């Protein structure tokens, strides 16, 4: 039986970002005690492919002399500060779209940079640019793998990091040296998280909106039909609350064919369970990551099929858009590539990738007027006017980040 209300719900989502193999998943394990790369292909290849999630409490503890230290383990003379959710984003260049969709959930970020490699590596640069584009300002730089380098190299690495972030959103971010593998200096990192990444304030009286980042079928093969559980959606509420028994609507829903036409039907279902981490709740609020058990056929939700959708109360969800008008803002240079490439202007009829909250879709530029572009989408999205959208372009067989847009209108 899952215990109720043993721990408060997480109050903040913190992204774990950086270049592949710089130790993000190991650092997540050191912070939370949880491995996030449990997908079979991830274990085989040793990299994160999907977004990983883990929650951890942070305790403020006092020793007999009154000195303070921070930890996830509750001991004597310890006060619970809060619970945080870690979003472990893949660092591999082919998985940039997954990292971008995860950034929609982040209230702050840990940018992991390995001391034993020159800084910046391609995805270090790309992920920092993504944080800038998505407006994530609360950043801590984690200088990892200090156990693998000399003192001189650690200092040289620190200087490389300072030069790299100069003039960026992370120019004044603290740099915390750690060894994630040996859990060295993790207490200092917890202290920095408490100081530099505050829990955002949300309006819990608004209609609930949840960005869906994962969806699952939790039934084991061979489960009797009478014991099957409904599909599960996972993500983060950005406003409002969900309670047990709520009727919810999921948009864009399910794609069906009517004659020669493709039709998208919104899905409605009932909330039958609410979980954050390993605890169940009667209601969930914004702040951390949560999983909602529903009465949906689990076949519909298996394998992240509902990723990129939005859930809300019935009739209170955003419209489904098949086209959008954006005010575009392009970077000077393509990021993530080993070569220095300038970003060329967007062209009419060009195909681009758009990350709208947790949804990744492809669209064709139909019309342009100055920096304003009109795009028809291959797959529709649920969105709001004023949302920030990441724009990617195919460069040398990879989707590369080239800028962002602000949604002006949706159709």
From Swiss-Prot:
| Molecular function terms, GO-annotated | GTP binding; GTPase activity; metal ion binding; translation elongation factor activity; translation initiation factor activity; tRNA binding
InterPro entries attached to this UniProt entry = eIF2G, eIF2g_C, eIF2g_dom_2, eIF2g_GTP-bd, P-loop_NTPase, Small_GTP-bd, T_Tr_GTP-bd_dom, TIF2_gsu
Binding sites annotated in the UniProt record for Mg(2+) 1: 25, 48
Where do the tr-type G domain residues begin and end?
A: 9-201
The entry marks the following residues as binding Mg(2+) 2, namely 21, 46
The cofactors it requires, by name, are: Mg(2+)
- List keywords of the entry alphabetically: GTP-binding, Hydrolase, Initiation factor, Magnesium, Metal-binding, Nucleotide-binding, Protein biosynthesis
The protein's Enzyme Commission number: 3.6.5.3
Keyword check for Transport: no
Matching entries from Gene3D superfamilies are given as: P-loop containing nucleotide triphosphate hydrolases, Translation factors
List of residues binding GTP: 21-26, 144-147, 179-181
Segments for region (G5): 179-181
Quaternary data? Heterotrimer composed of an alpha, a beta and a gamma chain.
Q: What is this protein called?
A: Translation initiation factor 2 subunit gamma
- Organism expressing this protein natively: Thermoplasma acidophilum (strain ATCC 25905 / DSM 1728 / JCM 9062 / NBRC 15155 / AMRC-C165)
This protein's gene is called eif2g
